[in-house]
C-alpha cells in the first residue's frame, strides 16, 4: 500500500533509547577523566596563588640571592595562568587528526598521557626546586584539555541515542563545573592550599586520568566511528547492542549507513574550505561570536582571580577562599538548572538572559569597586555582583554555546567547525588569562566595563542573527541559515549534507 508499491522496503521505526548501565558508566568514565581535568586545572591555581608565588620567589632567591621584582613576578604568574589555554589552543588543532586516526575513545585514552606526565612533574617540582616544571606542565595540561574539549562531546554524542543526546551532552559541562568546585575545596588552606600540601594539590590531576585508563577500555568505541569511518558494521552492531540493551537496532544502523553514503559523496570539509563556503558563512561567524563572547565576557577573569576580586570587594583575605567555594556551589546549581530549562525555554532565551545578568553585574561591580572606600557597606553588594555574574554565566553563556554549535552544523562540516570553535575558545581564554592582570593593574575597577560592553555586543548579535533552534530538526535550522546566507537549499539534499551551491565540488578530507 505504501512503500511496497514503489518497490522499496517500509521504513524501520526507531526505538526510543534508554539509559542503559553501559552507556551510563561509559559516560561517567569518559567525562570524569576528561571534562573534570579541564575544570580542575582551570581553578586549581586560583585560591593558593600566594603560596605558589612564595615558592617562585624562594626558588629565585636561592638561584640569584635576590627576590623577584613586582614586574617579573607579574609576568611569571601571568605565564603560569595563561599557558593552560595556550596549550588548549594547540590541543584543539590536533583533535581533528586524532579523532579520525585513533577513534573517539582511542583519542581520550591517548590523551591521558598529557595529564599523567605533568601531574608527576608538578608533584616533584618543589623537591626539584624548579618552578619551570609548573609552567611547562600547565602547557601540557592545556593540550590535554584542548583535545578533550572536542573529543569528549563527540564521543558522548555518538554513544547516546537521539532522545538522550541532550541529557548526555550536559554531562560534559557538569563535570567541568564539578572539577572547578573540587579544586576550590582542595585548595583551601586547611586542606592542600598550603606550603606543605600544594605539590599534592597539583599532582591530583593525574588521578582521574589514571582511573579513565583503567576503566574506559572496557566500554565500546563510538558505533558511528566504527561504521562510518572504519566501515566495520559488525563492531558497530556489537557496540549498539551493549549501549542500547536490546537487539532491535536496524533503524539506527540504517541511519548510520545513510550518513556513511552521504559522507562518501560529500567528504569531510576542511577548516579552510569551511571558511570559504558562503553557505556556512553565518554559522561560522555565529560560533566565533558565541565562543569569543563566552570567554571575553570575563568568566575566566572571575575564575582565575576570584580571590583578588573578593578582596577588592571588601572580603578579608582569610575568608575569601570560603566565598570562592560558595560561588562554586552557585555554579553547579545554575548549570544543572540550565540543563533542565534549555529544552523548555529555548537556547536564545537562556543566552540573552545570561548575558543580560552578566553585563548588569559587571556594571554594578564597577560602581561598587569605585566607591566602596567611601561607602564600606557596598562591599557586600560587590560579593552579590560576583555571585550574580557566575549565576548568569552558568545559566546561558557557559553551557548553551556547545549545544548551538552542534545544532547549526551538519555532519559533513561538524568536525571542522569543532576545530574552529575550539581554537577560538582557547585563544580568547589565553588572551584573558594573560592580559587581565595587567589591565586590572592599569585601569582597576574600570576593567569590568570592558566585560559589560562585550556582554552587550554579544547579546545584540544573538538577538539579531541566531535563530531559536529548540524543537527544530537539523534540516529546518539549515534552511533558516540558507536564507540568511542567500543560497538555495536543494530539496533533495540529505540531512547529513550541508547546504551549498549546487555547483560546489566535493571537499577532500583534510585535517586542517
Curated annotation (Swiss-Prot):
It is a multi-pass membrane protein. It is found in: Cell membrane; Apical cell membrane. Residues 43-78, 129-138, 194-198, 303-321, 372-379, 437-445 are extracellular. InterPro entries: GLUT, MFS_dom, MFS_sugar_transport-like, MFS_trans_sf, Sugar/inositol_transpt, Sugar_transporter_CS. Keywords: Cell membrane, Glycoprotein, Membrane, Sugar transport, Transmembrane, Transmembrane helix, Transport. It comes from the Eukaryota. PROSITE patterns: MFS (PS50850), SUGAR_TRANSPORT_1 (PS00216), SUGAR_TRANSPORT_2 (PS00217). It holds the Pfam family Sugar_tr. Glycans are attached at residue 57. D-glucose binds at residues 294-295, 300, 331. The chain crosses the membrane at residues 22-42, 79-99, 108-128, 139-159, 173-193, 199-219, 282-302, 322-342, 351-371, 380-400, 416-436, 446-466. The keyword Cytoplasm does not apply. Residues 1-21, 100-107, 160-172, 220-281, 343-350, 401-415, 467-512 are cytoplasmic. One of its GO terms (biological process) is dehydroascorbic acid transport. GO terms for cellular component: apical plasma membrane; plasma membrane. One of its GO terms (molecular function) is D-glucose transmembrane transporter activity. It catalyses: D-glucose(out) = D-glucose(in); D-fructose(out) = D-fructose(in). The keyword Nucleotide-binding does not apply. Residues 491-512 are annotated as: Disordered. Its main location: membrane. PANTHER family: SOLUTE CARRIER FAMILY 2, SOLUTE CARRIER FAMILY 2, FACILITATED GLUCOSE TRANSPORTER MEMBER 7. Belongs to the major facilitator superfamily. Sugar transporter (TC 2.A.1.1) family. Glucose transporter subfamily. Probable sugar transporter. Even if its physiological substrate is subject to discussion, it is able to transport glucose and fructose. Does not transport galactose, 2-deoxy-d-glucose and xylose. This is Solute carrier family 2, facilitated glucose transporter member 7. It comes from Rattus norvegicus.
Amino acid at each position: 500500500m505504501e512503500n511496497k508499491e514503489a518497490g522499496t522496503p517500509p521504513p524501520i521505526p526507531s526505538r526510543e533509547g534508554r539509559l542503559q548501565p553501559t552507556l551510563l558508566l561509559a559516560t561517567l568514565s569518559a567525562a570524569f577523566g576528561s571534562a573534570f581535568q579541564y575544570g580542575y586545572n582551570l581553578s586549581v591555581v586560583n585560591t593558593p596563588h600566594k603560596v605558589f608565588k612564595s615558592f617562585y620567589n624562594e626558588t629565585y632567591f636561592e638561584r640569584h640571592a635576590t627576590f623577584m621584582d613586582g614586574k617579573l613576578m607579574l609576568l611569571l604568574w601571568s605565564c603560569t595562568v595563561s599557558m593552560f589555554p595556550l596549550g588548549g589552543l594547540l590541543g584543539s588543532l590536533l583533535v581533528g587528526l586524532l579523532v579520525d586516526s585513533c577513534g573517539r575513545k582511542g583519542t581520550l585514552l591517548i590523551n591521558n598521557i598529557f595529564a599523567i606526565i605533568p601531574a608527576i612533574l608538578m608533584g616533584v617540582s618543589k623537591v626539584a626546586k624548579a618552578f619551570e616544571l609548573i609552567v611547562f606542565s600547565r602547557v601540557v595540561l592545556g593540550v590535554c584539555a584542548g583535545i578533550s574539549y572536542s573529543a569528549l562531546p563527540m564521543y558522548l554524542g555518538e554513544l547516546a541515542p537521539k532522545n538522550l543526546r541532550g541529557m548526555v551532552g550536559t554531562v560534559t559541562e557538569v563535570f567541568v563545573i564539578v572539577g572547578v568546585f573540587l579544586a576550590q575545596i582542595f585548595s583551601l588552606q586547611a586542606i592542600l592550599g598550603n606550603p606543605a600540601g600544594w605539590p599534592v594539590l597539583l599532582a591530583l590531576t593525574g588521578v582521574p586520568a589514571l582511573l579513565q585508563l583503567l576503566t574506559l577500555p572496557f566500554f565500546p568505541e563510538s558505533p558511528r566511528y566504527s561504521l562510518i569511518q572504519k566501515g566495520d558494521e559488525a563492531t558497530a552492531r556489537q557496540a549498539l547492542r551493549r549501549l542500547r540493551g536490546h537487539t532491535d537496532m536496524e533503524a539506527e544502523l540504517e541511519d548510520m549507513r545513510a550518513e556513511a553514503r552521504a559522507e562518501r559523496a560529500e567528504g569531510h570539509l576542511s577548516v579552510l574550505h569551511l571558511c570559504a563556503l558562503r553557505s556556512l558563512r553565518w554559522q561560522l561567524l555565529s560560533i566565533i561570536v558565541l565562543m569569543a563572547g563566552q570567554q571575553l565576557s570575563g568568566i575566566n577573569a572571575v575564575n582565575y582571580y576570584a580571590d583578588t576580586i573578593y578582596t577588592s570587594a571588601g572580603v578579608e583575605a582569610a575568608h575569601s577562599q570560603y566565598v570562592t567555594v560558595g560561588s562554586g556551589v552557585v555554579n553547579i546549581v545554575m548549570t544543572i538548572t540550565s540543563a533542565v530549562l534549555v529544552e523548555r525555554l529555548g537556547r536564545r532565551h537562556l543566552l540573552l538572559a545570561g548575558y543580560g545578568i552578566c553585563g548588569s553585574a559587571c556594571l554594578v561591580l564597577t560602581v561598587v569597586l569605585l566607591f566602596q572606600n567611601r561607602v564600606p557597606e557596598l562591599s557586600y553588594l560587590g560579593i552579590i555582583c560576583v555571585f550574580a555574574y557566575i549565576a548568569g554565566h552558568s545559566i546561558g553563556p557557559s553551557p548553551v554555546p556547545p549545544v548551538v554549535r552542534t545544532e547549526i552544523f551538519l555532519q559533513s562540516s561538524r568536525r571542522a567547525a569543532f576545530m574552529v570553535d575550539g581554537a577560538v575558545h582557547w585563544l580568547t581564554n589565553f588572551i584573558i588569562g594573560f592580559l587581565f592582570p595587567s589591565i586590572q593593574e592599569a585601569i582597576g575597577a574600570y576593567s569590568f566595563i570592558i566585560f559589560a560592553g562585550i556582554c552587550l555586543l554579544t547579546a545584540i548579535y544573538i538577538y539579531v542573527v541566531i535563530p531559536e533552534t529548540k524543537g527544530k530538526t537539523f534540516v529546518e535550522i539549515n534552511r533558516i541559515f540558507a536564507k540568511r546566507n542567500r543560497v538555495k537549499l536543494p530539496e533533495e539534499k540529505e540531512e547529513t549534507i550541508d547546504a551549498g551551491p549546487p555547483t560546489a565540488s566535493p571537499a577532500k578530507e583534510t585535517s586542517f
